[in-house]
Design a protein with these regions (language model features):
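Catalytic core of carbohydrate-active enzymes
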Residues: 56
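Protein kinase catalytic-loop region centered on the HRD/HxD motif
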Residues: 59-72
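Conserved catalytic-loop position in the HRD/HxD motif
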Residues: 76, 81
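Cytosolic eukaryotic protein kinase-like domains
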Residues: 1-52, 88, 92-241
């Protein structure tokens, strides 16, 4: 069974900080051409910063799913619920839709009956939720993969580009792995061409998009485990020295 997470005071982890006044990972960072108030922002997240943020969020999810007294499903992971401090350390916040999973083994696929309607935000909700499937840790993983796709393409999953059956996932999958730079955030490419050789940047993007695509598989059982996502992204981070 599951029940609402009414307090997060007992959820202690470096990358879990609900309710704190930190800046969200929203348009100011991911879509600098449309910053707050409509002004154009010159601040672009570097490749290293994006990978570090992605790792922080993966570690937070892994803690929620696997290292508490009971698994916790966030149910609404999206950029505005990822909070950044002054050092660009990411913390996952807003547990308003989160659920404690009681009597579940987080190491197996055990969806929890969804009796109160779809949980989450359009664009980040896994397909099984829309078909009446129960909430699960795999659902959070799907939302995480979508977050990764947005972070490295600067495209929202609800972008008008994605019509007629196309999605942000199919957009990236069509370019993976040979043409990943064609779908990557242009501002990221322009910034990193001064810091990384083209081959190194492309290899890093391939690794990140591999994680994102594995996390957003249609079948929940096929999705990557958070610990595997952490391992692969840590390899990308370590490549920067």
């Amino acid at each position: 069974m599951w029940r609402p997470l009414r307090t997060t005071s007992s959820v202690g982890h470096l990358h879990l900080l609900p309710g704190e006044p930190y800046k969200p990972l929203t348009s100011q960072w991911l879509h600098p051409s449309t910053g707050e108030g409509g002004e154009r922002s010159s601040r672009t997240l570097t490749m290293a910063e994006r990978v570090s943020i992605a790792l922080d969020v993966a570690e937070a999810l892994d803690y929620l799913h696997n290292h508490g007294q009971v698994p916790i499903i966030h149910c609404d992971l999206k950029p505005s619920n990822v909070l950044l401090d002054h050092d660009m350390v990411a913390r996952v916040g807003d547990f308003g839709l989160s659920r404690f999973v009681q009597g579940a083994n987080s190491n197996s696929f055990q969806p929890i009956a969804n009796t109160t309607g779809i949980k989450g935000t359009i664009g980040y909700i896994p397909p099984e939720y829309g078909m009446g499937g129960g909430v699960s840790v795999e659902g959070d993983v799907y939302s995480y993969g979508t977050l990764l796709l947005e972070m490295f393409t600067a495209k929202r999953p609800t972008d008008p580009l994605f019509q007629g059956g196309q999605s942000i996932r199919s957009y990236v999958a069509a370019a993976y792995p040979e043409r990943v730079t064609a779908v990557a955030d242009l501002s990221l490419l322009q910034h990193e061409e001064r810091n990384l050789d083209e081959e190194s940047l492309e290899e890093s993007l391939v690794s990140v998009f591999r994680v994102a695509l594995r996390c957003t598989e249609e079948s929940p059982r096929a999705r990557m485990l958070t610990r595997d996502a952490i391992r692969e992204l840590a390899g990308v981070r370590d490549a920067y020295g």
